[in-house]
């Protein structure tokens, strides 16, 4: 749990310092199929821990964010293809993933 706090704090700081260079509305990439971290409720809205963290980061940066969902297997390629601006996922860091994206 302590590591997650450090990761989310680092993400908040990184996003906060770069917010001025970003669009007014950011696209938050999320899987939405891994409860309780992320999933869809009965109305089709994305909910869960990852979504709450993403919303808190956006509020802290004072920017509007929209949610873009992606299948897990395509989430890193979608980020690299700029289908969303940042990724919120309870994802373990592996050498393969570190080679593809930056973690904060």
How would you describe each model-predicted region?
Residues 83, 96-104:
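Ligand-binding "clamshell"
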Residues 9-17:
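Hydrophobic helical h-region of N-terminal Sec-dependent signal peptides
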